Amino acid sequence: MQQVLENLTELPSSTGAEEIDLIFLKGIMENPIVKSLAKAHERLEDSKLEAVSDNNLELVNEILEDITPLISVDENVAELVGILKEPHFQSLLEAHDIVASKCYDSPPSSPEMNIPSLNNQLPVDAIRILGIHKKAGEPLGVTFRVENNDLVIARILHGGMIDRQGLLHVGDIIKEVNGHEVGNNPKELQELLKNISGSVTLKILPSYRDTITPQQSYVNMERHPAHVRQVFVKCHFDYNPFNDNLIPCKEAGLKFSKGEILQIVNREDPNWWQASHVKEGGSAGLIPSQFLEEKRKAFVRRDWDNSGPFCGTISNKKKKKMMYLTTRNAEFDRHEIQIYEEVAKMPPFQRKTLVLIGAQGVGRRSLKNRFIVLNPARFGTTVPFTSRKPREDEKDGQAYKFVSRSEMEADIKAGKYLEHGEYEGNLYGTKIDSILEVVQTGRTCILDVNPQALKVLRTSEFMPYVVFIAAPELETLRAMHKAVVDAGITTKLLTDSDLKKTVDESARIQRAYNHYFDLIIVNDNLDKAFEKLQTAIEKLRMEPQWVPISWVY
């Protein structure tokens, strides 16, 4: 493995391997778990045992034939013959030869046992008494439900006290706690167990069900088998279990914020997954499943509905229906529901593109130009195409690439443009191939495009780092505009109405496309905004990154 790692840097030129594949391979081979498995494999290979012979009993009998005549001559021979003829020693040799030759007879069939069906009522002597030790306020990591007037364990949270001890299982019935019957109220039992400290004695009626360990029930996120790999998701909404009226146990919930990375450890319940924080660690907690949260967010109240909230019903709800039209692409995006996004952890690497998103006039172009001027060896950008005629002082390929309108229309129809538009009767646009040309030179291509283009860019082909340049408050924006006008940097005067449009447009873009953004920078000072962006880009080269799973598999 070490030799492979040392030669990885030479592979791209010699084999034509994709850079992202090599980064992923390096990340796997440098993983401590993989290294430990490799060491264990080597040790097992080195110490592999093989039987010297599988006919030792036959060999001993031949020895006995040779030395038996010498019994009367030598006492040691007599003692050895006695040992070799010992029934236990003969049986040991016979067992060794059977194992060495791997010749096993089927065991005799045992008489059929009358085992009662597990579905029948369990006998009284099946009741078990368990003892645990806990601190006051420490959660056990279980939730309960009422079943046939009994309190039954509904789920065991991954990494919790009960999960670590392995004494209880889903379906077990709780009969008593410290000698007192528990009744049939799950909330009362949760409070009782939460407040108890010291030794706790539980009387349970086991379920005798086949239990599945949390490691066997990782999420199957559609394309990949659940048990093969760990599953991580990026959250696109804030969640506080104490504000959720649907969660079966608020104390068992896991609070998280938008943008956090969670590890999903169990998805057996269609409505409530078990997850844990990747950054903070700790035991797992309940979070709403993709299905449940989509269901909650997909329904809107009718305009005429004033009947108040209903629990567990959607009779007074309606779905908003909309046909997808390319002319209403932005409107369709506004209603896109984003809950969780599956991600994978990658070693540090340079992104292929840096995409700056924001409202018109927030400073995206100024930031882009500053990066390219200060470090042209690392950053580049595209040259836009246009159908207008070049002016006298313009050269093809500098500010614009000039093509005929018919050629440009044909390429637009063929999907060769990332974005395009028309101004004063002329077409303008950014070609997809021009982005790849910059990337192929080893530089990061900086783009300031419309947010709708993110659907095309957010793939493994472009690997974008998406930064939203947010507009500051109206007062700050007004002061910034006055400063650039007074300094003679611009002669274009903007009214308060223009500035307010910028602020409103910035807020609209953030609401609709927030789930695409890797970083948000409020541009209330161009120098500070540049420093923040520069720091973030440098971190990409030094720290591991969480990227969409589709970039890896």
Curated annotation (Swiss-Prot):
The UniProt entry, under InterPro entries, shows:
GK/Ca_channel_bsu, Guanylate_kin-like_dom, Guanylate_kinase_CS, L27_C, L27_dom, L27_dom_sf, MAGUK, MPP6_SH3
Is Repeat among the key words of this record?
A: yes
**Phosphotyrosine PTM positions:** 513
Per UniProt, which keywords does this protein have?
Answer: Membrane, Phosphoprotein, Repeat, SH3 domain
Query: Does Phosphoprotein count among this protein's keywords?
Result: yes
List, alphabetically, the CDD domains matched.
GMPK (cd00071), PDZ_MPP6-MPP2-like (cd10832), SH3_MPP6 (cd12038)
Q: Where is the Guanylate kinase-like domain?
A: 351-538
Subunit structure of this entry? Interacts with CADM1. Interacts with the LIN7 proteins.
What this protein is called in its record is Protein PALS2
* Organism this protein belongs to: Mus musculus
